[in-house]
């Protein structure tokens, strides 16, 4: 099928960019950084600018080896803009913009791919649906009357994934990694579909993916391509088209210089933390208590595609198809199954993409919902392509497709009902950091607004079910686009006011009231945003008695940039941000602190260090040892 006219492509891409801006740029930076990981990324990027060290990120005075530097570089460039602290006082615009732009870039790439290589609906019809050997459907308009709308629907199917709506706005590396892996995967398929496409582009993007989150990017792309070429057949000529040997060299030229410099400068510390802990150990062992069952990503798959999960499952089955499994059993495939023209294989490629992510991270010991993000563009392609199927056709009624569509509408209606019944379940929410959340959420009317928009989506999807194929999916999606600025973002702002603002107020009070060189600590609930918004090194300790013992000893002995140890005779007091629950524990009683400020559940104390050390000695005598010097794979 021929590509759409250039003007049509441009109009669709402009519309896609506009919708992406509404979803991911609207009110970006209006809320603070969400604890705990985003402030660590933001503070690391800002420290690059302040320290002039663009090789290794640092946070709270210590090197941070968790990720390669690309996301930190992009954030740092924005923090380096003149006057950034004045026009971006919360710091969340500069730190979140790379995630937002990366997400919009994936939307544009999905749309552009479908605009240049429209896929006929017959590929995902029931009863096999594959062209005969060597066949290419003729009559682009007849085969797919609305490819422009299909392209737009694919972009929105990606952007409206619940996972993307969350990670597309927060300053971590996941959105950028998803973009680099996805853009590389799409560029590989485009090269397979058209030899005129540049062979260097996917390998360059793969190098950037390695600079975003490490060598796992190479493993993922290799798995995707291997699975696709295995099912597609004729792997050797297609693999030669990708030029893997010079391509991998190009990827290495992009990524390896930083790795070499980091290893040369920081040596064993970098190797043990980045390679050993954050890459190998995450795959082979559980880290940070992220132990999940082997089937963890199956419900993540279902939730990430809501409300069109039934469409995704139908498309996945048909794109791979029962015939494909014959190859795994060593049985021959019908010729048509392997002879699918490369430019018509996008659905099969998307299915292999999704399955590769599913299988790889299912095998990993550490499992997190964010690991599913690189699969969401593939899911979006499958949803958009299966939605091209007609409600009625000359071949009869596709009952499976109709059932999948009706189930998708039922899920949208069910979510609308859940929002409408908010007064029944919201009061059951118990969040110690936001005790007034249920009452304020119900009083805001946001749940009612959300219920109306989800109900409208289900209604429009039903009323337009028999209209030209892409319209029905867009009818479902557009009210959900409005749901983001109308209900989701205001809810986010409410949570920030209740949960994030008190920490920012504590940071402001500590900055205003601290004596010269007076150290700052936080015990109990640990919030890295206190470090970011105070601009000071913060000593963090937990709620256990060992936390008090560690704090007293660290004030005397721990030396890190921005934190100079001293005995109580030199620095007699310390500022401590403590939450209400921790402050009520017996071992924090009787220290006679001076309360300087309070906000939410937090208190700012000025603590006499001699009393603190006496209490620490009592706790040590009772069997609570120092633990802060014990080896840890990561700390801040």
Walk through the language-model features, giving the residues of each.
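Membrane-integral, polyisoprenol-dependent glycosyltransferases
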Residues: 1-126, 130-399, 598-601, 605, ...
């Amino acid at each position: 099928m021929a590509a759409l006219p250039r003007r049509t492509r441009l109009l669709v891409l402009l519309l896609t960019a506009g919708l992406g801006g509404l979803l991911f740029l609207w009110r970006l930076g209006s809320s603070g950084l969400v604890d705990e990981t985003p402030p660590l990324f933001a503070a690391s990027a800002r420290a690059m600018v302040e320290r002039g060290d663009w090789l290794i990120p640092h946070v709270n005075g210590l090197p941070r080896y968790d990720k390669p530097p690309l996301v930190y570089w992009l954030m740092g460039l924005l923090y380096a803009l003149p006057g950034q602290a004045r026009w971006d006082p919360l710091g969340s615009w500069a730190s979140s913009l790379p995630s937002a732009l990366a997400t919009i870039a994936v939307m544009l790439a999905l749309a552009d791919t479908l605009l240049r290589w429209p896929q006929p609906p017959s590929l995902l019809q029931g009863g096999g649906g594959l062209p005969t050997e060597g066949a290419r459907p003729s009559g682009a308009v007849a085969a797919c009357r609305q490819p422009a709308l299909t392209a737009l629907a694919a972009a929105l199917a990606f952007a409206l994934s619940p996972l993307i709506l969350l990670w597309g706005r927060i300053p971590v590396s996941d959105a950028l990694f998803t973009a680099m892996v996805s853009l590389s995967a799409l560029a590989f398929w485009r090269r397979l579909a058209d030899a005129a496409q540049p062979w260097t582009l996917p390998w360059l993007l793969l190098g950037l993916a390695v600079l975003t989150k490490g060598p796992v990017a190479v493993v993922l792309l290799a798995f995707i391509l291997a699975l696709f070429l295995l099912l597609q057949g004729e792997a050797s000529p297609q693999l030669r088209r990708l030029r893997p040997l010079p391509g991998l060299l190009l990827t290495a030229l992009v990524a390896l210089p930083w790795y070499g410099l980091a290893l040369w400068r920081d040596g064993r510390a970098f190797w043990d933390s980045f390679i050993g802990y954050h890459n190998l150990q995450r795959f082979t062992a559980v880290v940070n208590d992220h132990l999940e069952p082997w089937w963890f990503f199956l419900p993540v798959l279902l939730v990430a595609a809501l409300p069109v999960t039934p469409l995704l499952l139908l498309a996945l089955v048909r794109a791979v198809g029962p015939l494909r499994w014959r190859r795994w059993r060593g049985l021959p495939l019908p010729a048509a199954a392997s002879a699918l023209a490369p430019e018509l294989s996008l659905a099969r490629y998307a299915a292999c993409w999704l399955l590769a992510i599913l299988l790889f991270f299912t095998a990993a010991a550490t499992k997190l919902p964010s690991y599913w993000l690189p699969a969401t563009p593939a899911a979006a392609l499958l949803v958009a392509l299966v939605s091209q199927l007609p409600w009625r056709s000359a071949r009869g009624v596709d009952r499976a497709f109709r059932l999948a569509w009706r189930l998708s509408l039922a899920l949208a209606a069910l979510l609308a009902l859940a929002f409408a019944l908010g007064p029944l379940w919201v009061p059951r929410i118990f969040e110690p950091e936001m005790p007034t959340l249920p009452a304020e959420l119900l009083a805001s009317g946001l749940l009612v607004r959300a219920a109306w928009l989800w109900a409208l989506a289900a209604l429009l999807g039903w009323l337009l079910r028999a209209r030209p194929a892409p319209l029905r999916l867009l009818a479902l999606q557009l009210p959900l686009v409005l749901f983001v600025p109308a209900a989701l973002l205001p809810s986010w702002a409410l949570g920030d006011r209740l949960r994030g603002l008190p920490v920012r107020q504590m940071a402001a009070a500590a900055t205003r009231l601290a004596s010269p060189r007076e150290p700052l600590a936080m015990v109990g609930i640990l919030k890295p945003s206190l470090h970011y918004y105070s601009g000071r090194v913060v000593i963090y300790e937990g709620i256990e008695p060992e936390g008090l013992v560690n704090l007293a000893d660290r004030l005397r002995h721990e030396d890190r940039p921005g934190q100079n140890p001293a005995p109580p005779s030199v620095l007699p007091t310390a500022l401590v941000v403590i939450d209400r629950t921790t402050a009520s524990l017996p071992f924090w009683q009787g220290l006679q602190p001076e309360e300087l400020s309070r906000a939410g559940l937090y208190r700012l104390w000025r603590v006499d260090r001699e009393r603190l050390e006496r209490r620490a000695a009592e706790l040590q005598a009772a069997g609570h040892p120092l633990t802060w010097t014990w080896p840890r794979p990561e700390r801040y």
